[in-house]
């Protein structure tokens, strides 16, 4: 509002509005709230600055520490700026409250205005023979003064409040705490993956569709005209009793009706369906190309990071894997003593003290050196991690069968053929028989 507008209203209006308002209490409460918020921002900024400085000073060293400090520095700066903005907002609220108090003090009060009106009424009522002309003029001049004073006070109050409103800072949103350069990388990925919508193809198709609609419209109009001509021929033939003209009119009306129906009920819906289908195909193709086009671009950095994390771990296993190349040392092992004579005699059988286990496989000559190794199955290798036995392990020389009355039974693996221990055999039914 401007001064002439304030002058357009009587002083009673301005005085009543200022006196009946909420007063400066709400502005002062808001100023106190902004001051408390400013102090809170300052405390958080100070605490975070200490943490960031401690990290950069040696608590956490290396590139990660540098990235941490670089990521939090903008947030600390925002906290400091937010504290300053909150303090400025508190000051502007206090300035607006002070302007209100000054305007209320300078504004003519309602009792003063009422007294002026009462004095004017008394002077006018007692103005016999014009004796109160000068007092009435002075009274009216005083009212004009209060009118101008009220307008001036309101103009000044408006200027103070407007300046406070303009000077109040607006704090922006807090920055996102991210790795430096991450936004540029994401923007580059988005720019590389998002392709523009094919508006050129859409414009060409719509142009072709518009031309097709125009041709269909011409077909419909020509069919309507042909139907009208055929109807005139039909009526003329009926009136003049001309059968050929009636037949011609009926034929023209028939083909015109077919053309009109074809255009309205077939071609127009087909064109509409084609337009919708083309729009759907372009939109879906654009969306799919952008979605699947982002996978290789985004997958490259992810796979690179994964490879960087896995390769050092695999390289660290090279020392352990190298132990597998150590040669296995074979130690000659004799037949366990516990196996000799460990078979108890079976009731009903005959114990042969000189019984030997007969094998279908010829044993190796005594002069031949046989490498006897422990089997590679069992409790596992003991000692160094990664040691392994040789693949050439002594094989059993045959099978031992627990015979029954029918002469067959479940096969049991024999001991390695290179051991050749003397075992106790059981003859007869239920004895041990070598096959």
From Swiss-Prot:
> What factors induce this protein?
Highly up-regulated during the early stages of invasion of the human blood-brain barrier.
> Which GO biological process annotations does it have?
response to host immune response
Q: Which family does it belong to?
A: Belongs to the mycobacterial PPE family.
**What is this protein's name?**
Uncharacterized PPE family protein PPE47/PPE48
Supply the source organism for this entry: Mycobacterium tuberculosis (strain ATCC 25618 / H37Rv)
